[in-house]
Amino acid sequence: MMRGNIAQLMQQAQKMQENLQRAQEELAKLEVTGSAGGGMVSVILSGTKECRKVRIDPSILNDQEMIEDLIAAAFNDASNKVDTESKERMGSATLGMSLPPGFKLPF
């Protein structure tokens, strides 16, 4: 009986590892847009939080302080969206198994 449980656990662990790998690959391809100032500034991040592009409306180019604030806000917006996507994708990849507190995915 015990041997069957161990084999089943090993199969689940292998399936979870495959699912995590697939989810990480999907996240690497993902692009998320964060925006601020009613769309005057937008930041595009990859699923690994690599900044791919920053767009700034030309109408605000003379206000450096506003641009700085809006870039930070747009980046944070995109970062939060990546976190949400990551949690959803990694959560489904772990087959519903709960992880210990503070255990962060991807590794």
Swiss-Prot record:
<protein>
    <recommendedName>
        <fullName>Nucleoid-associated protein XF_1808</fullName>
    </recommendedName>
</protein>
<comment type="subunit">
    <text>Homodimer.</text>
</comment>
<dbReference type="GO" id="GO:0003677">
    <property type="term" value="F:DNA binding"/>
</dbReference>
<comment type="function">
    <text>Binds to DNA and alters its conformation. May be involved in regulation of gene expression, nucleoid organization and DNA protection.</text>
</comment>
<keyword id="KW-0963">Cytoplasm</keyword>
<dbReference type="Pfam" id="PF02575">
    <property type="entry name" value="YbaB_DNA_bd"/>
</dbReference>
<dbReference type="GO" id="GO:0043590">
    <property type="term" value="C:bacterial nucleoid"/>
</dbReference>
<comment type="similarity">
    <text>Belongs to the YbaB/EbfC family.</text>
</comment>
<dbReference type="GO" id="GO:0005829">
    <property type="term" value="C:cytosol"/>
</dbReference>
<dbReference type="InterPro" id="IPR036894">
    <property type="entry name" value="YbaB-like_sf"/>
</dbReference>
<dbReference type="InterPro" id="IPR004401">
    <property type="entry name" value="YbaB/EbfC"/>
</dbReference>
<keyword id="KW-0238">DNA-binding</keyword>
